Amino acid sequence: MTDSHTAGPFIAAIDQGTTSSRCIVFDRDGRIVSVDQKEHEQIFPKPGWVEHDATEIWTNVQEVVAGAVEKAGITRDDIKAIGITNQRETTLVWDKNTGEPVHNAIVWQDTRTDALCKELGRNVGQDRFRRETGLPLASYFAGPKARWLLDNVDGLRERAEAGDLLFGTMDTWVIWNLTGGVNGGKHVTDVTNASRTMLMNLHTMAWDEKIAESIGVPMQMLPEIRSSAEVYGEITGGRLGELLGGIPVASALGDQQAALFGQTCFSEGETKSTYGTGTFMVMNTGDKLINSYSGLLTTVGYKIGDQDTVYALEGSIAVTGSLVQWMRDQMGLISTAAEIETLALTVEDNGGAYFVPAFSGLFAPYWRSDARGVIAGLTRYVTKAHLARAVLEATAWQTREIADAMTKDSGVELTALKVDGGMTSNNLLMQTLADFVDAPVVRPMVAETTCLGAAYAAGLAVGFWNSTDDLRANWRRAAEWTPRMDADIRDREYKSWLKAVERTMGWLEDEE
């Protein structure tokens, strides 16, 4: 065992992510006992298209679960349940009799359904299904991806209508395989993943037949919608059946919702922000379903067993960590990602430069696909160190815009922001965040909040933890940054940022 003070029992969590799958074993204090991880191939058949091989992913999931258990030096008797968290919206259709995918999974970033989404919104605009689903018509969501497969793979629609095919996001694929696959695998999804298909009605928490018909997805393909924390079935069959047969599969949450749960944001108004390639900020809105008029998504936060559904508001930023990578790989201004902080610290401010990284348009709160990146305010005075600072400030200003939108929609002021993800190791960025959103920024001890959230939900489902109070008691602060910026300077610079954002819009003309 990796940790001398850790005695069982344990909970395991699978994180089926965009670039890799991993499994983490946690103890009762929410501490990490072991980790195993394996990357899978990113497939780019055409510009704007992104696919994954779901068979490769299932193979990797089995490997990392076996690997994490082996590294922890434990057996099936030590593991009380396994939970699942996953990249959201990534869409798969498979044959229920053979277990074979009919096509690669279409990944959330894939934009091939742009034209279909425009067509679906033709007379009514992108808010056609927003009142029921909380989502704008965008290529991001799963329903239109399923329709694309049905329209473009030979014979698929007939097979779907005959009841031979199953649709699912990655949680559904993993659960179906874990619980037996063709031999009685459970075809289920949880409310958080279902809320990202554009096919679930947030008011009824059930599939919306009218919307499914409008989008063109047969109801018989869809999984059963369950809560985020309950026993869906047991591990059976296959490689893991021998190793871990009988262990309950007891939670599923989309990755951002899992991070909200892992950060113990259980009260209305509590908010977390995950800083990775892009950034996702999620606010718990309690039992209130808040329609956003400020460009946020209304979504499900989580649902524990038969307790009430907890809703959330979400704002997503397309480019944050990937802007630092761009500075390193395309511009050559830094040689490692960590260097951005060192370079930015050599100057006091941004030298008047503002960098809006609208590389593929702007996400929340604008949703403008015609925008492209801009560096504004350039003079001869500006050095690469000023640009490094402008790069970090871009992430902080975009967070501020979403925080403002959340306050506007919910009427709740942000009192603190819990953060996680790779970029949180950048202390200058964290201080800048606190300064710009004018609230304390807090980083927890366990950075793997996504996996932790799935483990927590699974543990609650089997009584490993009794209540969310137990989980709150586990949450430990590693670092906190408080605002140190003069309010007048903040307001002045925010104005300049908003001016720079305006300059990005309308760059692409319709015919492009």
UniProtKB/Swiss-Prot annotation:
Binding annotation for ADP: T18, R22, T277, G321, G422, N426
Q: What is the lineage of its organism?
A: Bacteria, Bacillati, Actinomycetota, Actinomycetes, Kitasatosporales
A GO molecular function annotation here is: glycerol kinase activity
> What is this protein's name?
Glycerol kinase 2
Q: Where does the chain bind ATP?
A: T18, T19, S20, T277, G321, Q325, G422
- CDD domains for the chain: ASKHA_NBD_FGGY_GK
Task: List the InterPro entries hit by this protein, alphabetically.
Answer: ATPase_NBD (IPR043129), Carb_kinase_FGGY (IPR000577), Carb_kinase_FGGY_CS (IPR018483), FGGY_C (IPR018485), FGGY_N (IPR018484), Glycerol_kin (IPR005999)
Task: Please provide one cellular component term from the Gene Ontology annotations of this protein.
Answer: cytosol
Identify the species of origin: Streptomyces coelicolor (strain ATCC BAA-471 / A3(2) / M145)
Q: Which family does it belong to?
A: Belongs to the FGGY kinase family.
EC number of the protein: 2.7.1.30
Top class in the EC scheme? transferase
Keyword set, alphabetical order: ATP-binding, Glycerol metabolism, Kinase, Nucleotide-binding, Transferase
Give the residues the record marks as binding sn-glycerol 3-phosphate.
T18, R88, E89, Y140, D255
Q: Coiled-coil stretches, from where to where?
A: none
Briefly, what is this protein's role? Key enzyme in the regulation of glycerol uptake and metabolism. Catalyzes the phosphorylation of glycerol to yield sn-glycerol 3-phosphate.
Q: According to the UniProt entry, how is activity regulated? A: Inhibited by fructose 1,6-bisphosphate (FBP).
| Superkingdom per UniProt | Bacteria
From the UniProt record, give the pathway where this protein acts: Polyol metabolism; glycerol degradation via glycerol kinase pathway; sn-glycerol 3-phosphate from glycerol: step 1/1
Binding positions (glycerol) = R88, E89, Y140, D255, Q256
Give the transmembrane region(s): none
Catalytic function, reaction form:
glycerol + ATP = sn-glycerol 3-phosphate + ADP + H(+)
Gene responsible for this protein: glpK2
Could you state one GO biological process linked to this protein?
A: glycerol catabolic process
